[in-house]
């Protein structure tokens, strides 16, 4: 399984190209890797781990779902590749500024929350790990934005109640601690 995850990591890194994390000089791929590592302590499901590595590819790169599927078919069976792509699609923001420029941030986030509440339990589980990793970085590097962001993600975790219970509780603890540390 580690060999497969290495190939998927390389694909994700290539897809993200020269993209860097917003608050550090790190290649973007460090974030999906950390998300995947968090999930590894809760599941060995290859589809969840692969989707974690690719969760921002559709949102942040020109790579398409079909290109991801074609790549995954080299390493996973068809059912696993399809499930992984479905998870990546679930985790891709729909109500973003690019697609909905007339909606303000609050409205976009509310619509996105309603959408996320309907995604699969596995998708919600990945979202918990994604939030945990982003909270660490944003809380430390952008305290002004963190005040808004932390309330948004707390609301997401409270609403997304179908994923891995232990990871959801851990994510809620991380967010609540970050909120407490803001004061």
Each PLM stretch: what is its role?
Residues 1-183:
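Active-site helical microenvironments for divalent-metal-assisted chemistry
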């Amino acid at each position: 399984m580690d060999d497969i995850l290495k190939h998927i990591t390389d694909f994700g890194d290539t897809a993200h190209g020269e993209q860097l994390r917003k608050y550090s000089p790190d290649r973007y791929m460090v974030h999906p890797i950390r998300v995947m590592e968090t999930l590894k302590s809760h599941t060995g499901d290859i589809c969840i781990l692969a989707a974690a590595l690719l969760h921002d590819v559709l949102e942040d790169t020109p790579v398409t779902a079909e290109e991801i599927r074609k790549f995954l078919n080299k390493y996973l069976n068809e059912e696993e590749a399809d499930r992984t792509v479905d998870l990546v699609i679930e985790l891709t923001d729909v109500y973003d500024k690019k697609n909905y420029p007339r909606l303000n941030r609050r409205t976009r986030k509310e619509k996105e929350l309603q959408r996320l509440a309907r995604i699969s339990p596995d998708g919600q589980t990945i979202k918990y790990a994604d939030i945990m990793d982003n909270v660490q970085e944003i809380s430390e590097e952008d305290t002004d934005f963190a005040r808004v962001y932390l309330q948004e993600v707390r609301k997401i975790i409270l609403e997304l109640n179908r994923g891995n219970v232990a990871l959801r509780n851990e994510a809620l603890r991380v967010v609540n601690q970050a909120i407490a540390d803001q004061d």
